[in-house]
Amino acid sequence: LKFDIFGFSRGAAAARHFVNEVLRVDGGVMSGHLHHALPAFVSEFEWSSHTSINFVGLFDTVAAIADPAQAHLSVGDAKNPGVNLSLAQGCANKVVHLTAADEHRHNFSLNRVNSEYHEELVLPGVHSNLGGGYPSVSRERVLLGRPKLVRGNYYSLTGLDSARLQASNGWQQREAAEAAFRAKGLPGNGRFIKQELKLQPNNHRATGQGSEGDVLLMLSMDRLMRGELSRVSLRIMHAKALESGAPFDILNEHDSRFSIPTDLQPIASKVITAAMAGKSAVLSNSEKRYLHGRYIHASANWNAQWGFFPNKPRADNQRAIYDDQ
C-alpha cells in the first residue's frame, strides 16, 4: 500500500500529521480502516511491512491552531497542540514544500520542513497564490496600512486646520506607506483611496478656529486582480510528483483550467525552470512589481470582520517562520 499525500494550508498541516500516523508501527488511526480483514487486502497484510509513503506535496503549511481550553488563543505562534508536524528524514521517498514569499499576515505563520532532508522552495505570491482559491478575475477592495488616529486637529479640515493635519506624524506615516506600496507595484491598474474621517469630538469647547476633534486617516486600494498565479505552483507540484512516480495524467496544455496567461508566461517559465532544478527563482524588481500589480493579492490588510482584523499584517510586514518541530 503506497501513499501519495498532498495538502494546502491547514490541509498541509493535516497531511504532515497523517504522514506520522501512517508511519506508526500499528498504523495509528488508519489501522482500524485499512487492515487484512478487508476484501481488498490479502490475509498476510501487515501495516508496518506493507505500507510506504512515496510523495508528500505541501503548499504553504499554516497550522494556525489554538487551544482555548488551555487559554492558548494565538494561532500565529509556534504552538500547535494536537498536531504532529515533524517530518523525519526518510519519512517518504520525496517531500516537496512550496512556500509563499509574500505572505505576512499575523495569523498565517509558516511551518517549515527540514530543508536538510526535504525540498523546500520559495515561490512568488501570498498564501492562496500558491494553494489556489482566487477567481480568475476578482475585485480587490482593501484597507491597506493601519488607520492613523491624529488627535487634537480641527474639525473643518480646511485652511490652517488642513495644514496642521498634513504636518502631523500620522499624515506623514500614511504618505510613507503609500510610497512603499507604490514601490512594490501597487495599485497596478487600480487606485489608492485616501480618506480623512472626522470623529465626533468629546469636548465641544469653542476655539478661535473651530471645534477640536480627532481625525482618522485611512489608505485603501481598489483594483481588479488575476488569479492564475496559483497555476504556476500547481504545475511545479504536478511535475515533481510525476518525477517521483505519482499516478497523475499529463497536464493538458489546452485545458483552460491549467493554462497560464500570455503575459505571465515569461515569469512563470523562470519560476518553474528554477524550481525543477531545486532552486527558488530570483526575480528582478520589475518582475516583482508586475506580479504585485496584477497577480499577487494584498492578503494582509486591515479590513474588519465582526470587529476583528483576521488578516492584519505582522509587525514590520515580516512573516513569522517556524522550523520543523
Language-model features: locations:
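Active-site- or binding-pocket-proximal scaffold segments within functional domains
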Residues: 1-325
